[in-house]
């Protein structure tokens, strides 16, 4: 089975009561839902969301709108410069990020199937 890699920006959010200690954003998936008390918790949560989205890749038209190349047997994400990753994360969260961590999240491509109502 093939693998899919995307970059995730993880940072300490100044509003920890709302977002958790760490928040994240992935411009390739437009996902800003993964947050938590540790970086490992954030990455684990994001991996689960990414696998779910990849399962639904043939039914989730936004992937193609966001520059992904998807088929029954493959998925290739768009590639972004690190500076863009950080600036988009700052724009989405409306904060200036100190000490951002860019983490490559690599998952096995799951079988394509509809698991959510998209």
What are these regions (language model features)?
Residues 1-11, 40-118:
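Short, charged, surface-exposed hinge/linker loops at domain edges
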Residues 26-41:
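A short, exposed loop/beta-hairpin motif centered on an aromatic-Gly-Thr core
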Residues 9-30:
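Short aromatic-glycine-(Arg/Gly/Cys) micro-motifs in beta-strand/loop hairpins
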């Amino acid at each position: 089975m093939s693998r899919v890699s995307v970059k995730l920006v993880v940072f300490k959010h100044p509003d920890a009561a709302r977002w958790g200690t760490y928040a994240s954003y992935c411009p390739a998936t437009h996902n800003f839902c993964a947050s938590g008390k540790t970086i490992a918790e954030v990455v684990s949560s994001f991996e689960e969301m990414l696998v779910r989205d990849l399962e639904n890749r043939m039914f989730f038209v936004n992937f193609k709108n966001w520059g992904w190349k998807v088929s029954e047997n493959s998925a290739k994400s768009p590639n972004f410069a690190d500076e863009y990753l950080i600036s988009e994360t700052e724009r989405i969260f409306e904060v200036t990020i100190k000490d951002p961590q860019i983490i490559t999240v690599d998952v096995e491509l799951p079988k394509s199937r509809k698991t959510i109502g998209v």
